[in-house]
Curated annotation (Swiss-Prot):
Pfam families: ATP-grasp_2, Ligase_CoA. The gene is Suclg2. This is Succinate--CoA ligase [GDP-forming] subunit beta, mitochondrial. Heterodimer of an alpha and a beta subunit. The beta subunit determines specificity for GTP. Gene3D superfamilies: ATP-grasp fold, A domain, ATP-grasp fold, B domain, Succinyl-CoA synthetase domains. It comes from Mus musculus. Coiled coil: none annotated. The modification N6-acetyllysine is found at K67, K74, K112, K133, K140, K201, K219, K228, K272, K348, K387, K407, K424. Substrate binds at N309, G366, I367, V368. GTP binds at Q58, G91, R92, G93, L147. The keyword Transmembrane does not apply. Its cofactor is Mg(2+). Keywords: Acetylation, GTP-binding, Ligase, Magnesium, Metal-binding, Mitochondrion, Nucleotide-binding, Phosphoprotein, Transit peptide, Tricarboxylic acid cycle. Belongs to the succinate/malate CoA ligase beta subunit family. GTP-specific subunit beta subfamily.
């Protein structure tokens, strides 16, 4: 059996890896990319799911108007009320509305104030560090009972590839950046590996509750909540359920105060109700258009469009462009099961961006057939009358056939032997202008 120190170190490593996964955020040398999860739930939606599965959360209502917010505050009849703007981006507390109101999270004891604040939130844009400069329009607010927290802990359930199954990770130090805790105090990180076939054992839930510092009757409460969170994790096909803080109140209740839930996109066919909750209103129109064709698109500030298959290769392409003195205009992931029509639509999206001065295609054909890519490229170039330089690097399945298609097309397409060569040629084509 591994020592407690080894387990803590492994759990800390898992948390740091979790922070780097594309489901949350990806940092590239080319800039800060924040890929939107293809299913992204608002805070109130996550809490509703938890509540429906027996997990204890604060009492709350959702309001679409200031009048509804006022009525909700009265119905709560709470000592103190917290009003939260509902957007997907983080940093709401320090955000600023274009109505002049500062802060997307407010505490008050007066229901009247809730109505007044909601009037300055709903229908206005809230700008935070994670939104575009102009902010994101707030369509709903959450009116919740504000509970005192006497102690904060951290709890997460996530998939661990090294274990080939779910793992529960916890720390008695919650309400803070858990990656920092894992790095500075790994002994405060605890881990329970769950057998996917047997499920969570009561002894595991009790042990985690004890490691989080819950004592007496609170220990049983915490273990019960941990078990319910695990069952929720399985039932909704989550890849991660993170509760921070997972805390206790002065009245002796264990409550999940805030939660982030990530889902397995491949489970959409059996989680239709959950996926129907996805709010795409905060997306850029081009992102929604890309999603119609199973393309993943993220706009950036540069002038070299990237057309790539696979998120990892897309990030590497952005980095190489940056290292060669260029700036990527986007992050476009074509994915695996490619059709010629997708290639055509991808080019339509890329050429619709007025910032784009060159296009770099970087495809590694494992599942992808390079010949299909080549046919899609030539069709797009002809029908869209492409006016910007096009650099193409293809490698893998049917690459020779693909190269012959490009060569015989008679189109002004620049071929590249590898990614470095492609990036240099794309950057040079823009520099000539």
């Amino acid at each position: 059996m591994a020592s407690p120190v080894a387990i803590a170190a492994q759990a800390g490593k898992l948390l740091r890896e979790r922070a780097l996964r594309p489901l949350l955020a990806v940092r590239s040398q080319a800039g800060h990319l924040t890929p939107r999860r293809w299913l992204n739930l608002q805070e109130y939606q996550s809490k509703k799911l938890m509540s429906e599965h027996g997990v204890r959360v604060q009492r709350f209502f959702v309001a679409n108007t200031a009048k509804e917010a006022l009525e909700a505050a009265k119905r709560l009849n709470a000592k103190e009320i917290v009003l939260k703007a509902q957007i997907l981006a983080g940093g709401r507390g320090k955000g600023v509305f274009n109505s002049g109101l500062k802060g997307g999270v407010h505490l008050t004891k007066d229901p009247k104030v809730v109505g007044e604040l909601a009037q300055q939130m709903i229908g206005y844009n809230l700008a935070t560090k994670q939104t575009p400069k102009e902010g994101v329009k707030v369509n709903k607010v959450m009116v919740a009972e504000a509970l005192d927290i006497s102690r904060e802990t951290y709890l997460a359930i996530l998939m661990d590839r090294s274990h080939n199954g779910p793992v529960i990770v916890g720390s008695p130090q919650g309400g803070v950046d858990i990656e920092e805790v894992a790095a500075s105090s790994p002994e405060l990180i605890f881990k329970e590996q769950i057998d996917i076939f047997e499920g969570i054992k009561d002894s595991q839930a009790q042990r985690m509750a004890e490691n989080l510092g819950f004592l007496g009757s609170l220990k049983n409460q915490a273990a019960d909540q941990i078990t319910k969170l695990y069952h929720l994790f399985l039932k909704i096909d989550a890849t991660q359920v993170e509760v921070n803080p997972f805390g206790e109140t002065p009245e002796g209740q264990v409550v999940c105060f805030d939660a982030k839930i990530n889902f397995d996109d491949n489970a959409e066919f059996r989680q239709k109700d959950i996926f129907a909750m996805d709010d795409k209103s905060e997306n850029e129109p081009i992102e929604n258009e890309a999603a119609r064709y199973d393309l993943k698109y993220i706009g950036l500030d540069g002038n070299i469009a990237c057309f790539v298959n696979g998120a990892g290769l897309a990030m590497a392409t952005c980095d190489i462009i940056f290292l060669n003195g260029g700036k990527p205009a986007n992050f476009l992931d074509l994915g695996g099961g490619v059709k010629e029509a997708q290639v055509y639509e991808a080019f339509k999206l890329l050429t619709s961006d007025p910032k784009v001065e060159a296009i770099l295609v970087n495809i590694f054909g494992g599942i992808v057939n390079c010949a299909i890519i080549a046919n899609g490229i030539t069709k797009a170039c002809r029908e869209l009358e492409l006016k910007v330089p096009l650099v193409v690097r293809l490698e893998g399945t049917n690459v020779q056939e693909a190269q012959n298609i490009l060569k015989s097309s008679g189109l002004p397409i620049t071929s590249a032997v590898d990614l470095e060569d492609a990036a240099k040629k794309a950057v040079a084509s823009v520099a000539k202008k």
